[in-house]
Amino acid sequence: MNKTVELLGDKAEYLLSHTCKTIDKSTLHLPSPHTVEEVWVASDRNIPTLNSLQRLLGHGRLGGTGYVSILPVDQGIEHTAGASFAPNPIYFDPENIVRLAIEGGCNGVASTLGVLGAVARRYAHKIPFVVKINHNELLTYPNSYDQVLFGSVEQAWEMGAVAVGATIYFGSAESRRQLTEIAAAFEHAHDLGMATILWCYLRNNAFKKDGVDYHSAADLTGQADHLGATIGADIVKQKLPTCNGGFRAIGFGKTDDKMYTELASDHPIDLCRYQVANSYMGRVGLINSGGESHGASDLADAVATAVINKRAGGMGLISGRKAFQRPMNEGIELLHAIQDVYLDPSITIA
């Protein structure tokens, strides 16, 4: 705890002593060593899928806790390889991406069909693979908010992956096509015995209004999580909420006053708790993203995000750029610091 308190600085008391008075923790399905048998056994997931979930939950420094720490490196497509790997060019080589995940103690590594396929025979049995099957590439001009399939569920299965990952840009012009596409892909993945992880991101220029970016609003992101759970995601990945009231500010959708008065407050843990609630009260695990690298503050920022996620009832963190856009030893240190939050029994559910 002492290292976490030191890293949190003047935020320590605010984040570590908060008691959630919105959605009570007793109503949540919280991560535990028995998550698969206590939550997923009751679902329609087949036995091979349960085995894949258990393998993911059982690996790395967080193995057996119910929490996950995943290294995601799909930015070579999403943000261009040059921009992503210029800070540390060793990560142009897929093997170093997988090495960082292994030495960083991660539960799994999430990357592209090409990256993981390049080293699958050497590493698929050493760390769980999550193959990302769709992407938004940055060579089509002008850029459009569309995720297109780069690989198939069968290709992920044949390389020994335990899970497939996909992104839906909720709110974008192509979101309904993406919904039906990924719903079908997730159904097929479950048939083959793989787990499913959905990047539930919002994309619409209208979600920015009066200088406020509502792409990370709790009400909008919570609904995106709910849609992700609806199409069969076992785990949803979401940005940490930074505000609320997106529906009302933009002037669309349906709301209830209690969404903003009783189910959430302006505290980041309560906002994240609202995301957990929308993920079937934690039956579908919520992992928050680490966000872009800002340099010297990355370690403290990552630890703060982990504390918020854990105390809200989330399942873990998926942190990429903060880990790989620096020397490998520093990336390993950052991943371990994130994991230490989930391993610390004194950091409790709010």
Residues covered by each model-derived region:
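Short, flexible active-site recognition loops that position polar ligands and cofactors
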Residues: 88-91, 321-329
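Alpha/beta enzyme core
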Residues: 25-30, 63, 75-287, 296-316, ...
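Short, highly charged low-complexity linear segments
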Residues: 2-4, 131, 346-350
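Glycine-rich beta-strand-to-loop/alpha-helix junction loops that act as flexible
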Residues: 286-292, 319-322
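C-terminal helical cap(s) of enzyme catalytic domains, especially alpha/beta-barrels
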Residues: 312-313, 324-350
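Short histidine/acidic/glycine/proline-rich micro-motifs that form metal-
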Residues: 170-172, 292-294, 323-325
